């Protein structure tokens, strides 16, 4: 399960950014996952719950947004979404398409409670 190593790196980044901002704790993390990123949301959530214990991210809510896959035909340049004929260009029927969106996986935002806020 590669989600474990992905989540470990994700947590390192989140904790580092939160500490840099002098946060008291992390309350929400907004993640973006491309349709073809190969990342399973439930696995990331499970790994995050376990790995974030005893960190300032413990109890933070993970929110996921999806980016649909998009392709560009290398033969005619037409761009198109994924569909029934996965990599077949609907314009020229060519089979030589490249993925131009949908492989992404990144942190969109981190919501924190800072030290200046009262309990």
UniProtKB/Swiss-Prot annotation:
Q: Which domain of life is it from?
A: Bacteria
**Alphabetized PROSITE patterns for the sequence:** HYPA
Q: Which GO terms describe its molecular function?
A: nickel cation binding; zinc ion binding
Which UniProt keyword terms apply here?
A: Metal-binding, Nickel, Zinc
Single Gene Ontology BP term?
protein maturation
Q: Which spans are transmembrane here?
A: none
Q: Where does Zn(2+) bind?
A: 73, 76, 89, 92
Against InterPro entries, the record matches this protein to: Hydgase_Ni_incorp_HypA/HybF_CS (IPR020538), HypA/HybF (IPR000688)
Chain positions recorded as Ni(2+) binding sites:
2
Gene3D superfamilies, alphabetically?
3.30.2320.80
Function of the protein: Involved in the maturation of [NiFe] hydrogenases. Required for nickel insertion into the metal center of the hydrogenase.
- Entry's PANTHER family? HYDROGENASE MATURATION FACTOR HYPA (PTHR34535:SF3)
Q: Which family is this sequence assigned to?
A: Belongs to the HypA/HybF family.
Designated name of the protein: Hydrogenase maturation factor HypA
The protein's organism comes out as Dehalococcoides mccartyi (strain CBDB1)
